[in-house]
Structures are given as C-alpha cells and as structure tokens.
C-alpha cells in the first residue's frame, strides 16, 4: 500500500500523500490491520513512543543474527517468520524505489517529499512491524501483548498515580513466572469422613473376646 502511495506521488496523478490515501480507500475500501491476527492492533503499538523502536538497520541485523536459518528456510516455521520475510522483502523493494526516485526525480521539492515520507512515516511502520515480530519470536506473543497492554495502561495513567518507571519487556517473563509460581494451591473442601468398615482382623479379635 505504501509503495503505491509513492507511485501515485511520482506519477502526479495524486499530488499529495493524503490524496493517494483517498484514492486507495476508494479503490479497495479495506481497513487492514497487520497485527490483528496476532492479537494486537496498530493502536496498541502506537502507545510506544517513536524513539522506542530501534532503527530498521539494527532490527534487520537482529533478525539476521537470531533467525537467519529459519527465515531462509523454504519451510513454514511460524506466522511471525512469514511476516518477517514479507517485511524484509518489502523494505528492500522500498529502498530500491527510493534510490530510483533520488536518481530520476528532477523536482527537488517532490524528491524531498518522497524521501521525508519514506524516512519518517514508512520507516516508523517498518520499525514497529519488525520489532513486534522479532519480540514475539524472542519473548513469546503472549508476553509481548501483555507488555503492550501494561505500557498502554502506564502511559495513560496520570503521572501522580503511576510508577516512576515504565514496564520493561525483558523483565515480564520473569515476573510472570514468579506470579505463576506464587499462586496458592486450591483448597479442596474436605469431604465427610466415611465410616471405615472393620477389618477382618478386628472382627476376629472381637469374636474371640465374645467367645471368652
């Protein structure tokens, strides 16, 4: 979708990004959230500040260092691996397009508009997307969702009523494990004691006493 925005700007059929978005909405009429199938939303990630996310270069290096074999494998590993593959390929195509624009677009103002849009708007979206899937593969999806919810609650709480430090993703698994281990076992309601039948030995001793 973002690549098509750029194509519309370059071809001047829609002179602004806002106009291209209107055209896309008219053509497709779809509201696609890439995080919904993973239990998150774009709005949930928007609670994290922009400078929270590492650069695309750092995220790509992290993905390559941790998951290179799985990403290059022809087999399906997980939905997160598939999403990472697509994001990495899209970013590569975007860089190719940006290079072409920088070399061929004559109007300096239009060139600056495209470069700024790529670096700020699209760069942030790719940083969010890469961070989310790398974190889910590293810490687990449930932990990442719990972190996003916790951070969203923290950032929306007035400063006077919230802890001084924001939640930290790397400490959530440990906290979760401690909380699970600290659960008190369920108490079972004691059942009424059944009257035990006398054992044969007890009955034999009683019969002997009666005989005596």
UniProtKB/Swiss-Prot annotation:
Spans annotated as Disordered: 172-212
Cleaved signal peptide residues: 1-19
Origin superkingdom: Viruses
Record family assignment: Belongs to the orthohepadnavirus precore antigen family.
Placement of Sequence repeats on the sequence: 184-190, 191-198, 199-206
Pfam families the record matches: Hep_core_N (PF08290), Hepatitis_core (PF00906)
InterPro entries linked: Hepatitis_B_virus_capsid_N (IPR013195), Hepatitis_core (IPR002006), Viral_capsid_core_dom_sf_HBV (IPR036459)
UniProt entry keywords in alphabetical sequence: Disulfide bond, Host nucleus, Host-virus interaction, Repeat, Secreted, Signal, Viral immunoevasion
Single GO term (MF): DNA binding
Function: May regulate immune response to the intracellular capsid in acting as a T-cell tolerogen, by having an immunoregulatory effect which prevents destruction of infected cells by cytotoxic T-cells. This immune regulation may predispose to chronicity during perinatal infections and prevent severe liver injury during adult infections.
Main location (coarse class): secreted
Maturation-removed propeptide residues: 184-212
Subcellular location: Secreted; Host nucleus
Region spans: 3 X 8 AA repeats of S-P-R-R-R-R-S-Q: 184-206
Natural source organism: Hepatitis B virus genotype D (isolate Germany/1-91/1991) (HBV-D)
Subunit structure: Homodimerizes.
GO biological process, alphabetically ordered: microtubule-dependent intracellular transport of viral material towards nucleus; symbiont entry into host cell; viral penetration into host nucleus
Residues annotated as site: Cleavage: 183-184
Post-translational modification: Phosphorylated.
Biased composition (Basic residues): 178-205
A GO cellular component annotation in the UniProt record: extracellular region
Region of interest (HBEAG), residue spans: 25-27
Protein name, UniProt field: External core antigen
